[in-house]
Amino acid sequence: MTNIRKTHPLAKIINNSLIDLPAPSNISAWWNFGSLLGVCLVLQILTGLFLAMHYTSDTTTAFSSITHICRDVHYGWIIRYMHANGASMFFICLFMHVGRGLYYGSYLLSETWNIGIILLFTVMATAFMGYVLPWGQMSFWGATVITNLLSAIPYIGADLVEWIWGGFSVNKATLTRFFAFHFILPFIILTLAAVHLLFLHETGSNNPSGIPSDSDKIPFHPYYTIKDALGALLLILVLAALVLFSPDLLGDPDNYIPANPLSTPPHIKPEWYFLFAYAILRSIPNKLGGVLALIFSILILAIIPLLHTSKQRGMMFRPLSQCLFWLLAADLLTLTWIGGQPVEHPFIIIGQLASVLYFTILLVLMPIAGIIENNLSKW
């Protein structure tokens, strides 16, 4: 009798994706982050669903409803903090996942990579709108500043901003629509993630050595199911520690002050995972220039495959490129730190230098390093 998991229409899809999937035998822990992102997404959808049952998207009651969730709803505080800190874990996994793709040349799987970039933009949009919902000071002013960036678009900018706001400032209409979008987007992310996996399974996964592994494949189950389960356990352990010991570590104290349009906080800044892009935005004095730099700082990932000059796929055997990669990682940490600092000397110049270095490494130095390494390998 044929095994039901190989014949049943639904079970067959699961079988081909999670059980009998041929996987390279040498993929390291850096390949765990894809499944961890799946765990984060499911966790966010579940905690978000329970929060939505008690949240009210009205400017007069939004802040109070969050207080109500934390004080009166049974285990509401843990659901709220798991959702808020779950977003931070989501972005840590995202950055690791993208970094892995850059390091090992996974961007050469172009369809998977491009869907990944769309996913990154969608997750960033979702997180931004989620940050507006508690209707604290940073929620309100963050929404005002970031949506206002669209006014830099020539001709239609001002009308576009008012259309998004649903009025002449961030108001009740803005909050309601942001809640609606924040609720629907994770399901769009789920669909995009399925397409991401579909394209990945068309070509098969990359591996640390960067050479084809068709001659050396092992079944996904039990080898990588147990490995992913361990990764998920560690992720939940870190998240639990964060939620139970210091839930406000990554948040902003200003968000415990109800939104007040008449009082601007001394330093408006987004959540920590957007600070690198925010620093790039602020490093350019011109508004439109800043917005373009902000968009291009993420969109630059789309042209990375075109800038690949090396004969080798990954950076495993390319010391020059490795140095540049870790310089890029340090540069992003510097930008993240600068994004959280006030706009004054010496932070302005540090931010500008770090921004220039970011684009220089990706657009100029890495392609040159690839060519140099090609020539060195001939010796």
Curated annotation (Swiss-Prot):
It is a multi-pass membrane protein. Its main location: mitochondrion. GO terms for cellular component: mitochondrial inner membrane; respiratory chain complex III. Heme b b562 binds at residues 83, 182. Keywords: Electron transport, Heme, Iron, Membrane, Metal-binding, Mitochondrion, Mitochondrion inner membrane, Respiratory chain, Transmembrane, Transmembrane helix, Transport, Ubiquinone. Binds 2 heme b groups non-covalently. GO terms for molecular function: metal ion binding; ubiquinol-cytochrome-c reductase activity. GO terms for biological process: mitochondrial electron transport, ubiquinol to cytochrome c. Heme b b566 binds at residues 97, 196. The chain crosses the membrane at residues 33-53, 77-98, 113-133, 178-198, 226-246, 288-308, 320-340, 347-367. It holds the Pfam family Cytochrom_B_C. It is found in: Mitochondrion inner membrane. A ubiquinone binds at residue 201. Component of the ubiquinol-cytochrome c reductase complex (complex III or cytochrome b-c1 complex) that is part of the mitochondrial respiratory chain. The b-c1 complex mediates electron transfer from ubiquinol to cytochrome c. Contributes to the generation of a proton gradient across the mitochondrial membrane that is then used for ATP synthesis. This is Cytochrome b.
